[in-house]
């Protein structure tokens, strides 16, 4: 449907966008203003309207009077009545400032707020109410959805309480149709993304920053439908005209809205995270194990009274591991909806916006734990492969030394003497090399390179003294016989050293050298994953401990008092 044909007459009509400063609300406001035949009342819970660089169109409209901003709390019906009076249509985009962990507040805003919006529209004589719903209201994660249409029934139980509330709100919108002249419909969009996204893409970015975006839940072959935000806005505007021309098929109905191009969920995620400079997902995890861990962590946090932030992660895990595609034939036929932005162009615009947003953020560069352990100096740069050429040369030189001392057939003393002899001859021979050979400059090693500064000698001497004094104190402590822990530490270390020297010192040194050039590098690459896995392991141990200790305490009590 051509948006310019939404109105048959030329004069401006007034619309209200409730939740107009939310992600999809902003997109709808911009599209309405670009059409030029609307006076837009932007209503949201914020006391003031904060504009940024992308809001130049709204800023001009506010100055010219084609747009106005109103602070409205949907829990307060008189405020809604006031802002909707005289309006032709109300777009209800949903709340933008939910405290997702306060379920009572969420219920008042989502469910009771929807009742207030419906009642206010009827009282103020609004003809059309279009509700921005979600495809989540037919999805509980228990079964895949393939080419689902509007005949799908809502689940009896939802995994997320917020989705349950949204399903209740959608039901209220449908029931309100054709009462006191009010026509209603609901648009169910599937996984909305776009510039200014505050939910899905930021969640992926946070996963990527924490290292979790490297994991694929399940096989990675599941298909999903995504919807670009501007296409959702376009569908809302199409619904306005359709409530007149196709009232019998649109009023009181719900419609699925997508980009009409199902893709693999993990291909989409890979485009986003890789486009923002993060590694693409590559490590597959069993879905059931992940969901069990989420449930365990949620239960532990709730039992400790720490609250829980695992609902979003749990919902994401269900979306990320299930096939979920929808049939939009009803929207195409009765609303005249077709996407105005392709999926590829939508992804490109989203990446461009978030790339600029990430550049503006002042993320402090934090040194990795591996870098700190290695002293954040030249040794760290070599072992962490910051300069691949230097690292390779260092590894090659150490391997040559290793071969020279352990596999040349000479004793350690003989090998050291021969090495010093070769070094001395090389230095002496370099002195006879001309400064230029065939026109190429030969850089000789200056004598000062072999000098050691007095401060370095003093620092080395101080370190030796500190180590010596620590050893003396340790021996004094051992001789007094008071510190058994220290005794076992020293005795164990000496015995381990004895085993290494007596068995195979060469094999031990080779293992240490190989680990140094690989272990620290691997640890730095997967530091966050290892940290979070360790955290989960500790949480599981804590859970097991709480389950076991009460039993132990009960069994230790005497049978007779």
UniProtKB/Swiss-Prot annotation:
NAD(+) binds at residue 166. It is found in: Endoplasmic reticulum membrane. It catalyses: a 3beta-hydroxysteroid-4alpha-carboxylate + NADP(+) = a 3-oxosteroid + CO2 + NADPH; a 3beta-hydroxysteroid-4alpha-carboxylate + NAD(+) = a 3-oxosteroid + CO2 + NADH. Its EC number is 1.1.1.170. It is a multi-pass membrane protein. The keyword Electron transport does not apply. It is an enzyme of class 1 (oxidoreductase). One of its GO terms (molecular function) is 3-beta-hydroxysteroid dehydrogenase (NAD+)/C4-decarboxylase activity. Its main location: endoplasmic reticulum. The chain crosses the membrane at residues 392-412, 420-440, 504-524. The keyword ATP-binding does not apply. PROSITE patterns: RETICULON. One of its GO terms (cellular component) is plasmodesma. It comes from the Eukaryota. InterPro entries: 3Beta_OHSteriod_DH/Estase, Lipid_A_modif_metabolic_enz, NAD(P)-bd_dom_sf, Reticulon. One of its GO terms (biological process) is sterol biosynthetic process. Belongs to the 3-beta-HSD family. This is 3beta-hydroxysteroid-dehydrogenase/decarboxylase isoform 3.
């Amino acid at each position: 449907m051509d948006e310019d044909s939404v109105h048959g007459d030329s004069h401006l009509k007034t619309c209200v966008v409730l939740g107009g400063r939310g992600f999809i609300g902003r997109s709808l406001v911009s599209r309405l203003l670009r059409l030029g035949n609307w006076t837009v009342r932007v209503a949201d819970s914020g006391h003031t309207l904060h504009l940024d660089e992308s809001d130049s169109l709204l800023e001009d409209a506010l100055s010219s009077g084609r747009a106005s901003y109103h602070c409205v709390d949907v829990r307060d019906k008189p405020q809604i009545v006031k802002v909707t009076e005289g309006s032709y249509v109300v777009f209800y985009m949903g709340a933008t400032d939910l405290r997702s962990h306060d379920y009572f507040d969420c219920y008042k805003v989502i469910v009771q707020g929807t009742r207030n919006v419906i009642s206010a529209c009827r009282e103020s004589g609004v003809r059309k109410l279009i509700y921005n719903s979600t495809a989540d209201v037919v999805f509980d994660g228990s079964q895949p959805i393939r080419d689902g249409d509007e005949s799908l029934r809502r689940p009896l139980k939802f995994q997320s309480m917020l989705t349950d509330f949204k399903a209740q709100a959608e039901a209220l919108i449908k029931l309100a149709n054709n009462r006191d002249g009010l026509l209603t419909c609901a648009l169910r969009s599937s996984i909305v993304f776009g510039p200014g996204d505050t939910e899905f893409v930021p969640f992926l970015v946070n996963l990527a920053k924490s290292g979790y975006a490297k994991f694929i839940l399940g096989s990675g072959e599941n298909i999903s439908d995504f919807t670009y935000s501007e296409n959702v806005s376009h569908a809302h505007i199409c619904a306005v005209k359709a409530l007149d021309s196709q009232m019998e098929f649109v009023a009181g109905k719900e419609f699925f809205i997508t980009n009409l191009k199902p893709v693999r969920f993990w291909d989409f995620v890979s485009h986003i995270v890789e486009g923002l400079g993060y590694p693409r997902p590559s490590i597959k995890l069993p879905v059931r194990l992940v969901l069990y861990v989420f449930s365990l962590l949620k239960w532990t946090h709730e039992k400790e009274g720490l609250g829980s932030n695992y609902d979003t992660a749990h919902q994401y895990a269900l979306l990320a591991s299930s096939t979920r595609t929808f049939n939009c034939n009803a929207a195409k036929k009765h609303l005249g909806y077709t996407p105005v932005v392709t999926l590829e162009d939508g992804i490109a615009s989203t990446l461009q916006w978030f790339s600029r947003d990430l550049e503006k953020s002042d993320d402090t560069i934090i040194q990795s734990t591996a870098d700190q352990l290695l002293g954040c100096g030249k040794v760290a740069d070599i072992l962490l492969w910051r300069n691949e050429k230097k690292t390779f040369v260092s590894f090659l030189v150490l391997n040559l030394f290793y071969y020279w001392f352990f596999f040349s057939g000479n004793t350690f003393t003989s090998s050291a003497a021969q090495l010093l002899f070769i070094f001395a001859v090389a230095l002496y021979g370099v002195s006879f090399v001309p400064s230029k050979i065939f026109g190429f400059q030969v850089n000789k090693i200056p004598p000062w390179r072999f000098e050691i500064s007095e401060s370095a000698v003093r620092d080395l001497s101080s370190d030796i003294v500190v180590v010596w004094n620590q050893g003396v104190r340790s021996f004094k402590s051992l001789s007094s016989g008071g510190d058994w822990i220290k005794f076992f530490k020293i005795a164990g270390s000496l015995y381990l050293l004895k085993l290494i020297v007596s068995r195979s010192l060469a094999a031990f040194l080779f293992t240490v050298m190989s680990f140094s050039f690989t272990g620290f590098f691997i640890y730095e690459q997967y530091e966050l994953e290892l940290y979070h896995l360790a955290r989960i392991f500790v949480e599981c141990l804590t859970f097991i401990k709480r389950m076991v200790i009460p039993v132990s305490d009960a069994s230790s009590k005497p049978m007779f008092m």
